[in-house]
């Protein structure tokens, strides 16, 4: 059964092999304990917060469980329809959201669009990302994104060159 579990995650129970990686990652890495198993033997299955839908649970949508899932039972909603996994090109970078400096691997499709972000197994994050680092990468493709520096003059922002912007920043403006 393939279900849209939340805005960011998708779950397919038929692919789950009950390995427990998602349960362990959520409990020991994220310290959240959203995932657990219910039932015994052939009735065992993965559940979140005692049968709550993942979107209604205490899940923080970090995606660590998806990154560690070996079968694709948990997947990213944002990747669907963006091209086959094997055609994605990886580029390593540093997350721009806060000052921690998490290492991150971005994946681009054939059109050059960023479609996925995964934690890089190095640096301060050791392969793990917060929800902003994991799902907040698509703003770079927005037509509303600023591409030139702006300087505030007489109460309004005006386009400037990089040299002017750096000079204004150095001057304390």
Predicted regions and their residues:
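N-terminal export/assembly segments and adjacent metallocofactor-ligating motifs
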Residues: 1-173
